[in-house]
Amino acid sequence: CGLCRRLKECYGKRGQLTLSYDMTFLIVLLTGLYEPKTIAGETRCIAHPLEKHPTKINEYTDYAASMNLILSYYKCKDDWIDERKKKGYIAAKALEPKIKKIESNYPEKVRLIHSKLEEINQYEKKGETNLDLMAGLFGDIMAEIFAWEPDAWELSLRKIGFFLGKFIYLMDAYEDVEKDIGNNSYNPLKEAFLQKTPEQFATECRT
């Protein structure tokens, strides 16, 4: 709830719509490690209007909100560039005014995120099927996001972010494979899915 609230306060309702569980996990992780001053409160929202929900906000909440917005912004841009999805164009344009401030606050992180997403995009255009390569690129993005600062925790945080990023990429590919086949969209698992029965495919992915 704290992340949702800060997304709305910092970036408006459109920012609030970018809420993700991976950035929520990042807040919990960084807060547990660094034990920053945290402000506890309560809030109501459209999703749960009848009762107040507890919120906890600290510097990592704002950081995660910024990273959340950057990832969503580039995703929307890619949707427009690759598939000419009008929703992607509209969403990217709506988020654009907020992006410049994030770029100035976290220039190195934004630069790496943008570079890796561009790399992913280029491989997608080539129809790359190397799962480890593709998942690893998104893992690099999450590794950079999870590394809050160069300190004793940095290496461990990068490892957590990297492998979580790989898992997220693979799970998204697995869940979207049938939809992507129907839409003729890129998915590194398409070839494997088409060569097997759904049951065989599911079993192989689980193992």
Give residue spans per PLM region:
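Acidic catalytic motifs of isoprenoid enzymes
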Residues: C1-K159, K166, L170-R206
